[in-house]
Amino acid sequence: QNXLDFHR
């Protein structure tokens, strides 16, 4: 899982 997934 990518912590940068917040950019959605």
From Swiss-Prot:
Keyword Mitochondrion among record annotations: yes
UniProt pathway annotation: Energy metabolism; oxidative phosphorylation
UniProt membrane topology term: Peripheral membrane protein
Any single GO BP term: oxidative phosphorylation
Compartments it resides in: Mitochondrion inner membrane
One Gene Ontology term, aspect cellular component: mitochondrial inner membrane
Record-annotated disulphide pairs: none
UniProt keyword annotations, A-Z: Membrane, Mitochondrion, Mitochondrion inner membrane
Coiled coil: none
Main location: mitochondrion
Subunit structure: Component of the cytochrome c oxidase (complex IV, CIV), a multisubunit enzyme composed of 14 subunits. The complex is composed of a catalytic core of 3 subunits MT-CO1, MT-CO2 and MT-CO3, encoded in the mitochondrial DNA, and 11 supernumerary subunits COX4I, COX5A, COX5B, COX6A, COX6B, COX6C, COX7A, COX7B, COX7C, COX8 and NDUFA4, which are encoded in the nuclear genome.
Known role: Component of the cytochrome c oxidase, the last enzyme in the mitochondrial electron transport chain which drives oxidative phosphorylation. The respiratory chain contains 3 multisubunit complexes succinate dehydrogenase (complex II, CII), ubiquinol-cytochrome c oxidoreductase (cytochrome b-c1 complex, complex III, CIII) and cytochrome c oxidase (complex IV, CIV), that cooperate to transfer electrons derived from NADH and succinate to molecular oxygen, creating an electrochemical gradient over the inner membrane that drives transmembrane transport and the ATP synthase.
Family per similarity comment: Belongs to the cytochrome c oxidase subunit 6B family.
Protein name, entry field: Cytochrome c oxidase subunit 6B1
Record gene name: Cox6b1
